[in-house]
Amino acid sequence: MNSDGPKSGKKRREIRAKLVKKLTSDEDGSGKLVKDNNKSLKRGREGKSDVDEPLIKKPASTTPLVTQIAKTSDSYLSKTRFDQFPLSPLTLKGIEDAGFKTMTVVQEATLPLILQGKDILAKAKTGTGKTVAFLLPSIEAVIKAPPASRDNRHPPIIVLVVCPTRELACQAAAEANILLKYHPSIGVQVVIGGTKLPTEQRRLQKSPCQILVATPGRLKDHIDNTSGFATRLMGVKVLVLDEADHLLDMGFRREIERIIAAVPKQRQTFLFSATVSDEVRQICHVALKRDHEFVNCVQEGAGETHQKVSQMYMIASLDRHFSLLYGLLKKHITDNVGYKVIIFCTTAMVTRLVADLLGKLSLNVREIHSRKPQSYRTRVSDEFRKSKSIILVTSDVSARGVDYPDVSLVVQMGLPSDREQYIHRLGRTGRKGKEGEGVLLLAPWEEYFLSSVKDLPITKSSLPPIDHEAVKKVQKGLIQVEMTNKEAAYQAWLGYYKSQKKIARDTTRLVELANEFSRSMGLSIPPAIPVNILGKMGLKNVPGIRVAPGFDKKPAKRNYRSR
């Protein structure tokens, strides 16, 4: 979104960060503050799960109306003011206080259609104001809804927003609270995977809300197990599927279908997505009306990545990856005052390993991944958002939608799961029209991935000469990394690449590559893996695998009589 200037943008980010913190933790990091419709804040426990874990039948296609947004500028901003639309004066006041002046392209394109009562599928690049685009009309729907009677034991939920991850859910709720500054009677709550269900049930009963933001699995839990919740959902007038492509990529088809079945057919539905895959189009036939509109805010020929982000890749053997990363970071830190770097790793445990190593190398590093509790992740996310001269090592929990301002460099270590994930990761930089840089670091046997991004402006970078001093420092740092971290990273690495079909075809070769990764961590012998884990991976009896002692035989029968 546009604003008065840098000061108002900074102020807005600070407000949002505080609200996210309130939504996910209290003073001791163990609770949740939730704005209710009685102007008070209610507390509940936070949870620990990363995202809810898990597709869509191909119905006969229909042809929706298409709205194409043609812009001569690369900017995501438009010249349209918010007060040019019939929005509530109190909402406009909140927008003004937040420093917003003009709309983004996606907001300008979708708002008039939504206000006409249309369902929409909106495609837009990341960081272009999609969240506010669906929140503004959602708030208007709440304002226009008839007030619930005071003796109603199950006051209706008017707006239901479904997000794929807890981070996105909390961020959307924080944005909503900014816009609701002058609407104290409108309550917002968040229900997310991993929290204690009874605590959320008590909070929902004690502090009814009109806007509910949720992750799919937890929402289904409430539909199935929370008294009166299904009745409350029958009041839904607006359903939002945020990051629809990500929801489907994560296998949430059944949950989405269950959610759609639980809300009234007479409703408005908005699907917002950075990419529009066949799966997204299929879910449209289930969720949207036949006359829904497709709003494409990506210019034809503009590409799927931001043009102000330079993209390059390096091909190097695994034994050079850590020292190359260290050299890349040192150069970037030297060249960029106030640098802000995000490093994406293939798994949570590899993330932990890389963060541990960079910490041993005296870099200012933080880590976020699914194995960290939500209170920790919220605190680190907030710190990274507000800080400069900092490095965040993360798994894909930070790949989509999360808004970190002023990220100067994104490094992707190892094979992205697919083209879309590469694009979303890269989208953490170059946001709000700013410049950024992206580097993809691959091993020679991962080079096949480049064919999937050959239409993107990504160029090959030659490898720098070996910096022997840097290599020594990295080797010393790896020695200091905890052995348990190396063992967990090895097992997770093997599991991740076992899921990559082109690599996993030859299991003997896969294990050879895993052992190469083990050596890159400074280990002369690869870690042993329990036989039950190897069985689940389909890697039993593969040459080169070490079975953990004590796990390769069936447990002996216990003689209870001798006790």
Curated annotation (Swiss-Prot):
Protein name: DEAD-box ATP-dependent RNA helicase 25
UniProt keyword Chloroplast, yes or no: no
UniProtKB keywords: ATP-binding, Helicase, Hydrolase, Nucleotide-binding, Phosphoprotein, RNA-binding
Residue ranges, compositional bias (Basic and acidic residues): 23-56
Organism: Arabidopsis thaliana
Helicase C-terminal domain mapped to chain residues: 328-479
EC code: 3.6.4.13
A single BP term in Gene Ontology: response to water deprivation
Phosphoserine: residues bearing it: S25
